[in-house]
Amino acid sequence: MHAVRAVPLLLVGALLAATACDGDQPQTGGGSGGGTTPSADSGKVAGTLPPLPPGFPTPVISGSIPTFIVALPDSVTTPEMARPWFDYFSWQSFIALNWPADLNQGRGNPLQPANPSIFLNASNSTPVTWGTYKESYELFSQGNARPSPFDSWQVAQPACSNAPQAQGQKVFVMTSKGNSIMDESAEAFSLPLVDQDSNYVRYEIRYNRAQYDTIRGPDSDSTLWLYLLTNLRRHSQLQMPATDSAGEVGSLMVKAAWRQMTARDDTTRYLLAHAQVLNPDGSCTPTTMGLVGLHIAQKLDSFPQWIWSTFEHRSNVPGPGAVAPYSFNNGDSLPRTPTGWANRPDSATLVPRAQRVPTQVTRLNPIPSTPASASTQWVNQLYQGYLGQTVWANYQLVVTQWPTQPQSFAQFGQGLYPAASGSPFPVNGATNTTAETYFQSQQDAYASGGNSCMQCHWNASKADFSWGLLRRAH
C-alpha cells in the first residue's frame, strides 16, 4: 500500500492534533509516496488561485493516502481554527482514493501514485483505487463460505444470478446505506432515496486491505475469523489496525452513493461506473451510474475514533458552490423541507418507477463557512481550482469530523467507547444529503445517536465503529 510518510502526532492544548513536521511544506513524503503540485504542463489546472493563509500546506496531486495531519501553526488554538488542516487531510485522501487503480497489481493499489498526470488526465470512467477495495457483500453475504482473499475477484455466492462479475466491475446490491443485500432492510438507514428522474440511489460500502484482512482473519487460525458473530462477541475489545507513525496505512472504510445516469445528465461531470445493478428477483441490469456521495473514514494511531470526511457532487442540492439542475431537488421552494427532506418513501420495499415520487432534499447543515480565513467552502474552491477541468472539480467536501480529545481504546475495559468519546468536532450536523438524507436534523437522528458520523458510529464501538461488522457478522 502506498502511503505518505507519517510523523508522530502530538496533542495541542488537549484540543488539537498535529504532526511535528514542518507545516509550511507540501505533504509529499518520501519514496514512491511523493507527489507534486499541478503545473500548467498538465493542461488541467485553472488560472488564478486564492492565496494560502499562513502555515496552510500547498495542495498536492498524489496517489498516496495521507497518514498524518500537517502541523498546525502556534496561532491555531481552537478546533474551528484547525478545521482547514483537517479539510486538507480530507481532500488529499479524496484525491488519493480516486486515483486510477492499477488492476494488474491486485486490488487497492494506485497506478503510478507519484505521477500527477495519471490522475489529471484520467478518463472519468477509469476504475479508481477505492473502487477496487472489497465490497461489503463480498465479505458478509457469502453464506457459510469464508470470504476470498483481498486480491481475489472471486466470490462463492455472486450477487447476480444472470451475469458474471467482470474483474473490476461494480455490482450495486444496496438501496440504502444501512442494508447489504437489498431485501435486508431492518436497519436505521434503510429507506431509499429517489432522484429527480424517479430512479433509486444505490450504495456500496468498501473496506481497504487492512480492515478487510482483520475481519476475515488470518488463514492460520480459524478462531480469529472475526466475521463470525460468535468471535466478535468473544473479542469484546476488537480494534481495527490504525495508520501508524511509520506510514503504514491502517483501516479505511468508504461508503458511496450512486445514481443512474440519464439523457438529461452531463455525464462528463461525474465519475462513472458501468455497473451491474441488482434487481429484486436476483437478476442484474447493466447500468451507467454516476457518483453523488462519498464517505471516507480512516483510523490513525492518534485518532482512534477515526477521522471522518464526506463529499458530494455539486449538483446534488442547492447551496454555496452548487450547480443546477439538481439531482435531488426540483429547484422550487415546494414541497417544504423543514428537516432537509420531503416525499420520503413510506417503506423500504422497492416499487416500480411509475409509482415513485422524487425525494425533495435540501442541505439542512450548511457546508462550514468558518474560519473566515480558510473555511471548508474556501478549501473547496482552492482544490477545485487545482483540479481544473478534471471531473473531480465537480465534487465538494461537505464536512470533516474528528476527535479533538482522542482517547485510546484501551481506556475502556469492555471495549465500548462512551457517547461523545473523543469530543468530536463539529459535534452535530456532519451529514451527507445522499447518505443521511433523513437524519439531517437532531430530531430525526435522535434514535441513531445523533446527526453526525461520530455520534452515530459510537454505537458500533464494540466493532471499532464499523456498523457493517456489528450488523452483518453472522
Question: How would you label these PLM feature ranges?
Answer:
Residues 1-10:
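Bacterial N-terminal signal peptides that target proteins for export
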Residues 25-29, 33-455, 460-474:
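Conserved small-residue
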